[in-house]
Regions:
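FMN-binding flavodoxin-like domain, especially the glycine-rich phosphate-binding loop
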Residues: 2-3, 16, 20-161
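Glycine-rich phosphate/diphosphate-binding loop of Rossmann-like nucleotide-binding domains
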Residues: 8, 14
Length: 161
């Protein structure tokens, strides 16, 4: 099964986070996962994918305008795919959880089935998605959460499709 990660990154942190999410997806047998910047999406691959996780940096408690514009204008066939979100931020209280909600709302409006890791899947919890904070540390410090989102998402995609 093909799964995709589509992200926007200004500083490289969201790109690194996307790679961790992709690596988590590939822990599931039979999954081929690829990550794409919004500027270089392989439309054929995403069209064939059963699910897509979107990631964006947090600016003023909102997803980057570039990701918002991408989601609002893309012509990719996303309806009925499994979707999820992750975000990056410089501060724990910087609004990254709001970004997860921003993206999830847009995915619902586009007709995706929004994945929730829920609390029943154990730690780390990824019920709205995954967020990573860079302040005082590195994105690598949140690698396990990002990989967990990718792996949980991939397991559900394989089960559904």
């Amino acid at each position: 099964m093909k799964l995709a990660v589509i992200y926007h990154s200004e500083t490289g942190n969201t790109r690194k986070a996307a790679e961790f999410v992709r690596a988590g997806m590939e822990k599931v047998e039979g999954v081929e996962a690829r990550a794409f910047s919004i500027d270089a999406v392989d439309e054929a691959f995403v069209s064939e994918a059963g699910g897509v996780i979107f990631g964006a940096p947090t600016y003023y408690a909102f997803a980057s305008w570039q990701m918002v514009q991408f989601l609002q204008t893309t012509k990719l066939p996303l309806t009925d795919k499994l979707g999820a979100a992750f975000s990056t931020a410089n501060f724990e209280q910087g609004g990254s959880e709001i970004v997860l909600e921003n993206i999830n709302d847009m995915l619902l409006a586009k007709g995706l089935l929004v994945f929730s890791g829920g609390v029943s899947h154990g730690m780390p919890m990824t019920h709205l998605g995954a967020n990573a904070f860079a302040a005082g540390t590195s994105i690598e410090a949140r690698q396990s959460v990002l990989e967990a989102l990718g792996e949980k998402f991939a397991k559900k995609a394989v089960q559904l499709f």
